[in-house]
Amino acid sequence: MRPVLRSLPLLLALALAGCGQPASSASDFKGEKKDVADTIEQLQSSAQSRKPEDICSEVLARGLVEKLKSAGHDCVDEMEKVTGDADDFELDVTAVTISGATATARVKARKGGKDGVLTSYTLAREDGKWRLTSLGS
């Protein structure tokens, strides 16, 4: 199994975790950095609303969707598998770096009251919007 697919359930369970809707971490940023953080917020919102099709069409970059497809997986099916666990997590964007048409968002995930995993998500500008090009690392 390819590395991106092997870690898919864990990474997406954290990424798609949704949250109990605390204050948005995107509000901590301005300009392009806020736009990047908003993409992470959109990931949470779509997961919490159980809308895997929105994640595939609005949040993930086309290249990532194609990578899933070329490995024999349907994006919507894969997102459906992990959005069932979207209630007990909180994602907090702690830092954003932008370099031209690419960006990295540092995200802290917490489950319940426990501090959790720090991970980085890479994004790229696609059709004027920031889209995830990775599922975290």
Regions flagged by a language model, labelled:
Residues 21-33:
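Bacterial Sec signal peptide processing site at the extreme N-terminus
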Residues 15-18:
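C-terminal motif of bacterial Sec signal peptides marking the signal peptidase cleavage site
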Residues 20, 68, 73-120, 137:
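Surface-exposed, charged secondary-structure patches
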Residues 1-9:
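Bacterial N-terminal signal peptides that target proteins for export
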Residues 43, 55, 123:
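Hydrophobic pocket/interface hotspot
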Residues 49-67:
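Short, well-ordered alpha-helical segments enriched in acidic and aromatic residues
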Residues 32-48:
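Short, aromatic-enriched amphipathic alpha-helices that serve as compact interaction elements
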Residues 124-137:
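Short, low-complexity, Pro/Ser/Thr/Gly-rich segments in the mature regions of secreted, periplasmic
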